[in-house]
Amino acid sequence: MVTIPVPRTTGGSLTLSLTFRAALDSFTGTLSDESNHSISVQGARHVWTTVRTSAHFAALYNATHELPAPQFNVSTVPQGIGYTQINVGNVGNTIWTGKLGDGTVITGSGTLWPDGRLPVHLLLYADKGSFTGVHQIALDESVTGSLSWSKSGPSSAADRIYVTGFPEITLVTTGHKWITAAPVFGATTLSTSFESGGIEVVAQYSLLDQTGALSTKNVLSFPGVSTNPTRITITLTPLSGLFVGSATLTDPHPVTNLPTARVLGFSGVLDSTARTGWGVFTLPSRPILPVETMTGRVRLNAP
């Protein structure tokens, strides 16, 4: 065991105690203060070289971050399904990007541990929240994880997305290696569905469930305006499995009763193994100030 004093200018010194496990290329330990409060610490040795490569992990992985069941349809909690796209290189190098369930864009990089773990820590919302935890990439090309997400208050005076924040939530993370296909999933059609985030009370809600024809070039074409009055469109990126779309919703104004348009934007990732895509949509409230934005779940289904 190695004990390292960590001096601080205020609050007393800290003590870092580490135990190294050379055979496992890892270490564990604790970081404690003078009052014996402590947190656990773990890490791994950087083992990847041009000789000992991470080629057995090297790929693009699409993972989703879903709320646990008790948080479903809780209006004070963002209801979108977040996602991360993780690119793993041959020397353990990783780059990842995605969105959280409130539409917040996330991006970062790091080093894959020898056992396929990828730690993530992001400070968000002007340091009033975070996204932190570990992705686990397995040799069977699946992704799981233990990641938590929180927001304690508005990030700025202009913040209009779940302004009061929400307590720490442990997300359900699943995913797989992305396998490019033409067309994706070998499908000829893909269908949309939307849930939560206030979408069910929209006047045109039932018209959002649409089925598009999928070409061999991965172009998704929806019917004309007579059967697709919200003009839903989706663009697929077959190399990564990302999908991005929009629709225009028309509701009566809550005061004037005149038709009022709102743009529903959404994005997500496809899962080669599950043959389904999940993601997050953003929906501005009807124009009664202040206009706030709610989020919910979007799903793209193959037959």
What positions do the PLM features span?
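Mature soluble binding/inhibitory domains
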Residues: 1-303
